């Protein structure tokens, strides 16, 4: 049984790694601004001595303690934007557990949110946002990937603080109405 488990793990490892590395190549791309926040940073944040009496601060610390990573890739370069669009389309097509959560078309922006189910209807294990369009008068493409145990009711607060374009739409997510 141990051998079978080990063999299955070896077979699945490249699939799992490729999902996480699907967008990492943009980190080294010219004309791409990237922000990658890892589990180590979230651990540091959760250990900060914030006012423990404040329930909002406690919710925030609990939320970041459950996150694995946040990756944001942004470009104004149209050629790179096409690569990013193709990477998102490929990732969504190849991720059978990833379902569309919400679409927003507003003020010259197209924003799509995708998610993988989490421990219950208020949580997801992955949240992917793909934005293309006009942001502050500039044509931009943004990919945001968040993994971990993500509370949909709380994540908009964090992404707003990170100033991720399009993240303001997260506050409109209805947690109990996901579609596949």
PLM segments and residue spans:
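Bacterial Sec-dependent N-terminal signal peptides
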Residues: 1-25
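Generic structural motif
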Residues: 4, 15, 40, 75-78, ...
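Early exported N-terminus immediately downstream of N-terminal targeting peptides
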Residues: 24-88
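Extended interaction-bearing regions that mediate binding to partners or small molecules
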Residues: 30-36, 64-70, 74-75, 93-111, ...
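Amphipathic, non-transmembrane alpha-helical stretches in extra-cytosolic proteins
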Residues: 45, 57-61, 72, 88, ...
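A general structural signal for short secondary-structure boundary/capping elements
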Residues: 81, 116-121, 173-180
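C-terminal partner/receptor-binding element of secreted or periplasmic proteins
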Residues: 149-180
């Amino acid at each position: 049984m141990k051998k079978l488990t080990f063999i299955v793990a070896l077979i699945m490892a490249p699939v799992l790694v490729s999902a996480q590395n699907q967008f990492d190549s943009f980190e080294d791309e010219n004309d791409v601004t990237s922000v990658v926040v890892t589990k180590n940073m979230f651990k540091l944040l959760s250990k900060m001595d914030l006012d423990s009496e404040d329930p909002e601060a406690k919710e925030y610390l609990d939320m970041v303690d459950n996150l694995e990573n946040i990756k944001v890739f942004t470009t104004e370069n149209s050629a790179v934007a096409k690569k990013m669009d193709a990477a998102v389309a490929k990732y969504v097509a190849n991720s059978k557990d990833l379902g569309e959560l919400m679409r927003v078309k507003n003020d010259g922006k197209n924003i799509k949110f995708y998610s993988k189910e989490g421990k219950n209807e208020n949580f997801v294990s992955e949240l992917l946002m793909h934005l293309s369009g006009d942001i502050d008068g500039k044509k931009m493409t943004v990919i945001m990937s968040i993994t971990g145990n993500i509370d949909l009711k709380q994540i908009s607060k964090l992404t707003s603080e990170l100033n991720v374009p399009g993240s303001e739409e997260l506050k409109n997510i209805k947690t109990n109405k996901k579609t596949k």
